[in-house]
Amino acid sequence: MNFFKIFIVIAITASSIAFAHSGVKDKNVKERMMLMKAMADNTKLIGQILKKQTPFELNEVKQALEKLSSLSLQTPTVFEVNATDPKSEAKQNIWDEFDEFTKLSNELAKNTSELANLVENIDDLRPTLMKVSEGCKACHSKYRE
């Protein structure tokens, strides 16, 4: 997957999440959406640094990756309640396959934490962002409308 495709996926995800929040009535769904928005924001920051729209600061990149790891670990918790809302993009199979959903989330947490320890300079960002995007896509392609 090339960088342009990754950036488009991030941009679409961030904009659809922001739009989706308006009018959400179920508190569980809103909590899930807020967590996903935080994940998108951290991923977007890395993309902006890679595109040189934001200056490279190693500590910021590491913090964004650690935050992604933490949010990934929280993801199964916010999906424990099978709550619905017309604005929700969560597919029913999340709860039908909750162990697999949790496994994918935990893998993303592990990978982003490892990446936070490996990234050293701006040249490391492209493969880092690709790895993060692959983890997001693994879950979204299966469990998101």
Language-model features: locations:
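N-terminal signal peptide c-region/cleavage motif recognized by signal peptidases
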Residues: 15-20
